[in-house]
């Protein structure tokens, strides 16, 4: 977030850090207070899977607060958003569907090459308004989807092919099994590490 704000010329001092618990989960009451004091357009960045602890923010109360103050809710789900695909972990993402936008990195859990990050926006018209390009050399076919309206680059290589191939190969059940197996492996590793002295 801080890097993106600097690149946009808004400066790293722009964001207001919301109080969090010891696992890095945003405190909804603190968010409510910050939104009540905010002046002007506001973006709230919640997280599905804290990079240091794996913790998930509580999306329902965060979405309620954002809705009350007309704030845009973005969920950084770089690796954790995939938890929604598995029955055993889906509860962690309860309410995430209420966000306005999401980010996910398929390489972090689907084992595809890096540089496959995706931004998903709930309202297609808002997405197109933010991304569309114009130029006399950009001629769109009125009967076809114009992909230049969905990405910041006018042209790019087919980054989605490995993601499509992984999803097609694994299927819904395979993705769910991958998520649940990896979580079980992480719990086993944590359990074994607690038995090591020092």
Kindly give the residue locations of the regions a language model identified.
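Active-site C-terminal subdomain of aminotransferase-like
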Residues: 50, 69, 85, 94-196
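Conserved PLP-enzyme active-site core in the AAT-like
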Residues: 1-128
């Amino acid at each position: 977030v801080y890097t993106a704000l600097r690149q946009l010329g808004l400066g790293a001092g722009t964001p207001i850090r919301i109080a969090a618990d010891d696992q890095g989960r945003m405190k909804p009451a603190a968010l409510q207070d910050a939104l009540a004091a905010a002046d002007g357009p506001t973006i709230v960045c919640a997280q599905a899977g804290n990079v240091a602890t794996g913790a998930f923010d509580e999306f329902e109360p965060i979405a309620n607060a954002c809705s009350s103050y007309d704030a845009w809710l973005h969920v950084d789900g770089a690796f954790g958003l995939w938890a929604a695909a598995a029955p055993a972990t889906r509860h962690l993402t309860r309410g995430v569907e209420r966000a306005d936008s999401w980010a996910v990195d398929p390489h972090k859990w689907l084992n595809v090459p890096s540089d496959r990050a995706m931004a998903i926006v709930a309202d297609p018209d808002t997405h197109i308004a933010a991304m569309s390009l114009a130029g006399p050399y950009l001629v769109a076919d009125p009967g076809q989807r114009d992909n230049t309206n969905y990405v910041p680059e006018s042209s790019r290589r087919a980054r989605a092919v490995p993601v499509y191939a992984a999803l097609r190969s694994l299927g819904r059940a395979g993705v769910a099994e991958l998520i649940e197996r990896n979580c079980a492996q992480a719990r086993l590793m944590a359990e074994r590490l607690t038995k090591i002295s020092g």
